[in-house]
From Swiss-Prot:
Chain residues that bind Cu cation Z3: H131, H434
Broadest EC class assigned to this enzyme: oxidoreductase
Function summary: Nitrous-oxide reductase is part of a bacterial respiratory system which is activated under anaerobic conditions in the presence of nitrate or nitrous oxide.
Species annotation: Pseudomonas fluorescens
Residue numbers spanned by region COX2-like: 543-639
Main location: periplasm
Residues that hold Ca(2+) 1 according to the record: K455, E470
GO terms under cellular component: membrane; periplasmic space
Protein name per UniProt: Nitrous-oxide reductase
Family: Belongs to the NosZ family. In the C-terminal section; belongs to the cytochrome c oxidase subunit 2 family.
Encoding gene (name): nosZ
Length: 639
């Protein structure tokens, strides 16, 4: 057996000790402003023009003390498992929303309230979230929910944006690795569309591991956005990568990079073409309503078969051939096109959405007749976003660039007209993946800002050891030229982000006492005869002890309680402060118990008092000048 390392075809190893900047040979500049001058035909900076450009770039992103950003940005946390909230254009981090991870600051994954939301999946303490998206009405953000996928454990979560907390998590049955996630845009977000990436046998019980078996497949998944329950699943040929939906409510589409159903790198690149699969949502709904569906593996979810049979299309899907291994799938903000990004091809494929009716009615001999352009943009196109002025912006992973191109001119060039549809190429640092322009996935794309999420930062920041931050770059696209104005280090590993106007997100200042987030805890207290806003009592129920207390900075309602060694202890605290931003905390030392209690919130946590002796609890939040004195004692008597 050879001891030679496996090599990716075409890959080149960087010499050890050589910086990324030198190896890539991008000629990247040290200042963000200079990078903004890489437009085609841009001139050389003079000392004066350098100073002017630097001043302009700084003013673009400066948000002064006490001033507010124009946009909310929602970033996926990747394999860290959370969602991050940033202000744009300042790129200041405002909040982290734990979802699939355990968070000791807020107690997410530790409190009883969060465990109820996590459900059976609470056993997983990891997640891999990629694609955050906000619910819509009539193609515009309504600010109600944000949805996020978990590729690691095949889940989809919903975040209530009024409280910036996750309120529902669904494990998608019959599939593995929920990756691409998008929402129905029109008439409203009725469905969350979620792609399962990996092909698996059905049933997946070890009876076979043959991916070529007819019962080995993956599925396109639709989730009822309000109920957070499965609506339907569609069996497909090949696998599924990224997806998007149209502006009519009729169609969704997904890329496929493994039409071969292979399990190795070489096999996945064997076919010269893969495809975009388009789903006819109305036909799927009609079939399910008529009872024309099956169920799988003991699940009750309606399943329809969207695979071809003997070369004949299913009524639910159409497969449009595109160059091999496409990645991103993006709907233009004018609602005209699905853009499939080539990845291994230097092209993107523009699919005319207004031709899809004819495609489903079998009026084309070749499904590629719905493709109206296939512009060549550069090496490694991954994702495309839009400015609402007819221009598209595509990340080029291999070239470490973003390319601005005009969609109408690309169509004219495809028809044979000599026109230069590429408007500018801008170096970014380095290897960009997702990108997102302000409001671009809605009908209100305003063409002001572009965020490019670069997978490598290398020499852009102070060194942090072998693990480097990512680099989220902010680009001004309000004028004719793209201008890089900010580098933002990010912990591993954001994949995508979205930008919404600040007026589209309405948040609560303090909790409503009737909030469903802790309604179950309120109901349990009621059974114990407890008024959570006034009572400070201990309820003993066999081996279980329920401790109820209020908190008002800087004191807990109970400063001492006694239990027996081995008791299961549930501490329930209600913050009766009514002042905005006066959050309290509760930590029981040496018991792994920690949680947040914000104004008017009730939180509870359960642990075992397994160590006899005195154990202090304290407020972990700096809620008052005397917060150090906000303490109490648990006295654990020997069993």
């Amino acid at each position: 057996m050879s001891d030679k390392k496996d090599q990716v075809p075409g890959a080149v190893e960087a010499p050890r000790g050589v910086s990324r900047r030198s190896f890539l040979g991008t000629g990247a500049v040290t200042g963000a402003v200079l990078a903004g001058a890489t437009a085609l035909g841009a001139g050389t900076f003079t000392r004066e023009s350098w100073a002017a450009a630097a001043k302009e770039a700084k003013s673009k992103i400066h948000v002064g003390p006490g001033e507010l950003d124009e946009y909310y940005g929602f970033w996926s946390g990747g394999h860290q498992g959370e969602v991050r909230v940033l202000g744009v254009p300042s790129m200041r981090e405002l909040m982290r929303i734990p979802v699939f991870n355990v968070d000791s600051a807020t107690g997410w994954g530790l409190t009883n309230e969060s465990k109820r939301i996590l459900g059976d999946s609470a056993k997983y303490q990891n997640g891999d979230c990629h694609h955050p998206h906000i619910s819509m009405t009539d193609g515009k953000y309504d600010g109600k929910y944000l949805f996020i996928n978990d590729k690691a454990n095949s889940r989809v979560a919903r975040i209530r944006l009024d409280i910036m907390k996750c309120d529902k998590i669904l494990t998608v049955p019959n599939v593995q690795a929920i990756h691409g996630l998008r929402l129905q845009k029109v008439p409203y977000t009725k469905y969350v569309f979620a792609n399962a990436e990996f092909v698996i046998p059905h049933p997946n019980d070890g009876h076979t591991f043959d991916l070529q078996d007819k019962n080995s497949f993956t599925m396109f998944n639709a989730i009822d956005a309000e109920k957070m329950e499965m609506a339907f699943q569609v069996i497909v040929d090949g696998n599924l990568d990224n997806s998007d939906a149209d502006y009519t409510g009729k169609y969704a589409a997904s890329t496929c990079y493994n039409s071969e159903k292979a399990y190795d790198l070489g096999g996945m690149m064997r076919n010269e073409r893969d495809w975009v699969v388009v789903f006819n949502i109305l036909r799927i709904e009609a079939a399910i309503k008529a009872g024309k569906f099956i169920t799988l593996d003991g699940s009750k979810v309606p399943v329809v078969d969207g695979r071809k049979t003997d070369g004949k299309d299913s009524e639910f899907t159409r497969y449009i051939p595109v160059p091999k291994n496409p990645h991103g799938l993006n709907t233009s903000s004018d609602g005209k096109y699905f853009i499939a990004n080539g990845k291994l091809s230097p092209t993107v494929s523009m699919i005319a959405i207004d031709r899809l009716d004819d495609l489903f009615n079998d009026r084309y001999k070749d499904p590629r007749e719905v493709i109206v352009a296939e512009p060549e943009l550069g090496l490694g196109p991954l994702h495309t976003t839009f400015d609402g002025r007819g221009n598209a912006y595509t990340t080029l992973f291999i070239d470490s660039q973003v390319v601005k191109w005009n969609m109408d001119e690309a169509i004219r060039a495809y028809k044979g007209e000599k026109v230069n549809y590429i408007k500018q190429k801008l170096d970014v640092q380095y290897q960009p993946g997702h990108n997102h322009a302000s409001l671009t996935e809605t009908s209100e794309a305003d063409g002001k800002w572009l965020v490019v999420l670069c997978k490598f930062s290398k020499d852009r920041f102070l060194p942090t050891g072998p693990l480097h931050p990512e680099n989220d770059q902010l680009i001004d696209i309000s004028g004719e030229e793209m201008k890089l104005v900010h580098d933002g280090p990010a912990f591993a590993e954001p994949h995508d982000c979205i930008l919404a106007r600040r007026d589209q997100i309405k948040t609560q200042k303090i909790w409503n006492r009737n909030d469903p987030f802790f309604a179950d805890t309120v109901a349990l207290a009621k059974k114990d005869g407890i008024n959570l806003e006034t009572d400070n009592k201990v309820i003993r129920d066999g081996n279980k002890v329920r401790v109820y207390m209020t908190s008002m900075a800087p004191a807990y309602g109970l400063t001492e309680f006694t239990v027996k060694q081995g008791n299961e202890v549930t501490v329930t605290i209600t913050n009766i402060d009514q002042i905005e931003d006066v959050s309290h905390g509760f930590v029981m030392t040496n018991h792994g118990a920690s949680m947040e209690i914000s104004p008017q919130q009730t939180s509870s946590i359960t642990f075992t008092a397994d160590k006899a002796g005195l154990h202090w609890y304290y407020c972990s939040w700096f809620c008052h000048a005397l917060h150090m004195e906000m303490v109490g004692r648990m006295l654990v008597e020997k069993a």
